[in-house]
Each structure stands twice: as C-alpha cells, then as structure tokens.
Amino acid sequence: MRRSPPKPWENNSGGGGSTSMTGSGGISRPMSGPQRTTSPGGGSSTTTQTSTLNNTGSPSTSVGGPLVTRPRTPMRPWESGGAGSSSIDSFGGGVGGSSGYRSSYGGGYRDSYSSGGYGSSGYGSSYGSGGSGGYGSSLYGGGGYSSGGYGGSGYGSSYGGGYGSSYGSGYGSSYGGSGYGSSYGGGYGSSYGGGYGGGYGGGYGQRGYDNMDGKGGALQSVVSSGHSWMEALHSIVDTFSRFSRLLDANFDAVHGSFSSIIRLCQSMSHFSYEIMAIIKTYSLFRMFQSVASRFLRVFRYLLGKKSKSNSSNNNTSSKFGSNAITESLRQANMDVSDFRNFQNEKKQSVGTLILIIAATFIGVPMVIGQLLNLRRRGQASRLDKGWEEQQGGGYGQVKAIYEFNPETTRDLPLRVGDIVNVIDKPHDNWWVGECNGLSGFFPVDFTEKISPNDINNNNNNNNNNNNNINTSVQIYDNNNGFNRNNSNNNLNNSEYSDYSSSNNNNNNNNNNNNNSNYQLQSNFSSNNDGISKNIIYNNNNDNQRPISPSKTSQQLSRSELMDKPYVEES
C-alpha cells in the first residue's frame, strides 16, 4: 500500500510556518486536536489548544497563552445553493477548492484514495461516489467513474443505473455496492469497501471485501448449507418416525394374535370343563342306576322273588325237563308234594314292599335326627354346666345379707337374699360379681358364702317393693343457684347423688325408713383441694349394719354432671 501524499493543511514549506492552502472561496479546515505552531527557530512545536465559542458563534483558540480567535466556518455550497469554489480539486470534485472538505484521489473528509470521515468520497470525491452530492451534478457529488450521492447518476450521471448509480444498483452505488453512494461496494460512501467511511476495510461495521460482489458471501453460504442440513435431518427423522409406526403396527398385530390364541385356549378350557361335567353327570347316573339295580335285587331277594334270569331258567327247565325231574325224584324216593306246595304258594302283597320302603326312607332319617338332637342337648348341657362353673364355680357364690345402694356407676346394687356369682376378686374388701343381669363391684362384708344346696332354698323376694324411701335429691349450681327437689320417690334398685362443684356441701339425709330401725346420715363435703371425701356418720345403727369400706371418689365437674341424664322414677 503506497503512502498517502501529505495533506495540504499539514505541509510545512522548508521548515517555515505552516501554510493554509485554500483557493478562492475556500474553507479553512477546523482545527482539532493538538496544533502545530512555528517556533522562532524554524521548528514546529505542538501545543494544546483550548477552543471556546465567542458571541458570534466562531470558535476562539488560545495558543500558548493569548486568546486567538479562529475564523468562522463559511457556509457550505449545498447549504447556500451555489458553488463555493471556483475550481474543483485535482482527480475529483469536492465541495470546492483543493483542500478542506474534500480530498484528492477520492478522499472524504480528509482521505486520500479511500479513508474514512463521513465517508470516503463523502462530500464530493473522485473514484468514488459522493455521499450527498447535488441532484445529479458532477460538481457537488459523484462524477468520474462512479455515481453521485443522492442522485449522482440518477438525475444526470453517466452509465445509467438505479437512483443514482453507475454500473450497478442500490441507492447510489457503483458496481453493485450498497450504502448511500459507494464505489466497488461499501457503506455510507466509501471506496473499495468499508463501512461508514473506511477504505479497504471496516468502518462502522461493514465487511470490506466480503461485500464487494454485492452478494451475501460466506453468511449466505452458511445459511444455505444449514438449510440443506436441516432438510436432511428432517428427512432422517421422518424416516425413523415411519419405521417406528411400522414397528408399532407389527406389535399391535402380534399382540392381537397372541390375545386371540389365549382366548382360544381359555375357551377350550371352558369347553373341557363342560365336557367333564357332562361325563360326570352320566357316570353318576350310571352309578345311581347300578346301585338302584342292586338295591332292587336285594329287595327281591328279601321278598322271595326270583330274578328274571332265574325265572326264565326255571320256565325253560320246567318246560323241557319237568318229567325228568319228577322221574329222578321218584327214583330217589322223595315226596314231590312239598315242592309243589311251595310253587303254589301265593305271592306277597304290595303292602309289605311299601312298609319296607317307608321304614327305610322315613324311619331311618327320623332316627338319625333324634340322635343328632340328643347330641346337641348333651353339648348344650355341658356348655351350660361349664358356664355355671366359670361364673360361680371358680370363686363360688355369695348371698347378700345386707342391702347395698351403689355409690358409683361401677357398683353392683344388692338386696337382702340376692345370690351373687363371684367373677373376680381384685381386692380383699371389694369383689366383682354378677346378679340379676348386672355386674359390678360389691363389698365383701355385705355378703356371706353359701353352698350350692342353699341356692334352691332361697325364697326371698328380689322385688323388694315395701321399701318406701323418702329422699330429697338436690343439685346445686354455683352460677345460677338452681335447686331441684325430688321427694317421695320409690327407688327399687339404686340411688344416685351427683355433685357438681368443689365448693358445694350436699347433705343426703335418709331419715325415714319404715322397714328398718336404723338411721344413716351421710354428709358429703369438699375441701379446698378439690378432692371429695365421703364422711359417714352412723348415729343410730340399731341392727348393727356394717359400714361399706371407704372409697376415695373423684369429684365430678359441672360439665360431666350436665352430660349425665337425670331420670326421675315415680
């Protein structure tokens, strides 16, 4: 790559001061970056400028200390509508003049042969399209061998083409390139490729030589090859799917045939079962027939009848050899009259046969039924005896000698003369017994042991209806002070008193008992620790009734008391 010629605004003539090359009406290039100033000795030194804008809009530059005002940028030709220069630079038209916003050999902002500002061949170039040239003029854009910018050769360029192109298409390209006006491909106005303004390569992102032919290049080839590969893969997958469907159909066919064979075997098994049932029925019929024939033979023998074979033999023998028999009997000096009398005997009546059949088919089952009933009665008696032994024989039986009114739901009520079957003896003073269909705990001191012989001599009346007990049952509630009095109740079996609060004192006084000469007074009180104690005061115990052993019972709460139903007995 050959070197680019020196730029006009950077030339130094013989080490003298920097010369600004501008033509008539030329525009000075804006100074950007470090500026070169000429030292008194002829050398150039680089100083940093500080640019500011004055009130008129022109930048001012401070070089080395004093403030230097930079000239105002003149109007551009496409902004003013006229030619801003009297001549066009060599090897291509710019905006005017030989330097500034134009370049030689296709320069853009400051390019030579390609480089990038706003685009090589940007605002007027040779050998490359103009970026934004006039509406078709060869002066302000385009010209030479390439197209103009907005219209380069659309509205007046040579060699025809799209909206302003030469030898190609696009919006203003040359030889097929894209962009706003490029030659030999390119981007926004570059020569020989390039992006937004690069030469021989990338600018803002173009691919350089890849887009020189105006086609997709490697990307298009990759896309096309990928498309072919996807089609091949799709065909392979479709083939496998068809093969899988074929295998599925074969599996269904094999499964159906196997199922049909299994159903056939099952049907054959049912058929063989039916055939065997028929054969069994026929064999049972034959067996029954043989047994019946033998049974009839036995009956015939018992009835004195001969079988058909014997009778036929007798008939034949009587026909063919009766005379011979008589002759032989005569020769043996035997009396034939007895034999003839036996033959002339009358046959037995049918009643005998009916009697035998009735005795066989009716009498025998009756006898068997009676035997079974006797066996059942024996088993029942043995079970009853074992139950009695289990209920009363294990621990024996006791007789109640005093009445016992249950104090809890687990107690067994007793009356004088009741026979109690002892079930268990969990404690020394309290046993578990059963009486009158009820079971529960009863005090041992209220009973006495008896022998089995004394049970039959018990003529006591268990329904002791002569006891007229006048009681008053009171239920106290702390919340609403409810008092309920039930008097003159005839209680035959039991008497219950419920206490709902740990702070209540319930006095159950049984003062009137016409049948006994004793008086039992019970005071139920509660202490502060919530444990109910049963304190029994025996004031008048005329008949020396023993007092039941003390039991510590848990006090019922109000909720438990309300849950229990209260039943009045009249």
Curated annotation (Swiss-Prot):
Source species of the chain: Dictyostelium discoideum
Coiled-coil boundaries: none
Complex formation: Interacts with PEX14; forming the PEX13-PEX14 docking complex.
Main location: membrane
Top-rank taxon: Eukaryota
Gene Ontology CC terms, in alphabetical order: peroxisomal importomer complex; peroxisomal membrane
Cell location: Peroxisome membrane
Function: Component of the PEX13-PEX14 docking complex, a translocon channel that specifically mediates the import of peroxisomal cargo proteins bound to PEX5 receptor. The PEX13-PEX14 docking complex forms a large import pore which can be opened to a diameter of about 9 nm. Mechanistically, PEX5 receptor along with cargo proteins associates with the PEX14 subunit of the PEX13-PEX14 docking complex in the cytosol, leading to the insertion of the receptor into the organelle membrane with the concomitant translocation of the cargo into the peroxisome matrix.
UniProt-listed InterPro entries: Peroxin-13_N (IPR007223), Pex13 (IPR035463), SH3-like_dom_sf (IPR036028), SH3_domain (IPR001452)
Alphabetized SUPFAM superfamilies for the sequence: SH3-domain
Protein name per the record: Peroxisomal membrane protein PEX13
GO BP annotations, alphabetical order: cellular component assembly; protein import into peroxisome matrix, docking
Compositionally biased tracts (Low complexity): 32-58, 453-543
Keyword Transmembrane: yes
Gene3D superfamilies referenced in this protein's UniProt entry, alphabetically: SH3 Domains
Stretches with biased composition (Basic and acidic residues): 560-570
Ranges for region Disordered: 1-91, 453-570
Ranges of Polar residues composition bias in the record: 544-558
Comp. bias regions, Gly residues: 13-26
Entry similarity comment: Belongs to the peroxin-13 family.
Keyword terms of this UniProt record: Membrane, Peroxisome, Protein transport, SH3 domain, Translocation, Transmembrane, Transmembrane helix, Transport
Keyword Nucleus on entry: no
Domain named SH3: residues: 393-452
Topology versus the membrane: Single-pass membrane protein
PROSITE patterns: SH3 (PS50002)
Gene designation per UniProt: pex13
Residues annotated as transmembrane: 349-369
